[in-house]
């Protein structure tokens, strides 16, 4: 996550997220007094909402998770990035990603894990098989995925046809 020492020096912060984001941020402000002094604006979104900010057109779509979750499509200068957030395989997220330059999609567990609220490589590859994607980055890997990263990316490639790599948190 973003260091709170960095956040405390910001003059203003715009936060966009699904229902519950305002309450979540207020709890952070209560726990970290420096955040209370920062001017902030929280805008809660729902599926099918769209807005523009600083040259980006942003579209929200429902993701499938244990709590309210959204995926986002960012468009600017003829480039498109889609970020899934936490989600099970979702036709809505796949449609949102269609034609994108980059899909950043969670892929928490390797095969043969049977999971809910998250995605495995075969389910992701199947979901994307009829969509046009230039590149996929797998994120949000759980410890069970350690040592299986290359295999997971290859499974998505074989089913979706999209070049796929595993992203790493810093």
Task: Give the predicted meaning of each segment.
Residues 1-83, 88, 95, 150-170:
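Binuclear metal-dependent hydrolase catalytic cores
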Residues 89-170:
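Cap/insert and terminal regions of metallo-dependent hydrolase folds
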């Amino acid at each position: 996550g973003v260091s709170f020492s960095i956040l405390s020096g910001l003059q203003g912060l715009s936060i966009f997220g699904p229902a519950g984001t305002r309450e979540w941020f207020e709890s952070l402000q209560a726990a970290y007094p420096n955040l209370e002094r920062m001017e902030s604006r929280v805008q809660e979104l729902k599926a099918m909402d769209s807005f523009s900010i600083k040259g980006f057109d942003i579209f929200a779509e429902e993701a499938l998770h244990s709590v309210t979750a959204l995926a986002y499509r960012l468009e600017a200068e003829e480039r498109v990035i889609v970020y899934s957030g936490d989600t099970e395989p979702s036709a809505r997220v796949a449609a949102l990603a269609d034609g994108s330059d980059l899909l950043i999609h969670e892929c928490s567990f390797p095969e043969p894990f049977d999971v809910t609220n998250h995605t495995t490589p075969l389910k992701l590859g199947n979901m994307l098989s009829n969509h046009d994607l230039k590149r996929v980055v797998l994120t949000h890997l759980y410890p069970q995925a350690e040592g299986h990263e290359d295999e997971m990316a290859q499974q998505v490639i074989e089913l979706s046809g999209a070049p796929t790599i595993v992203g790493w948190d810093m």
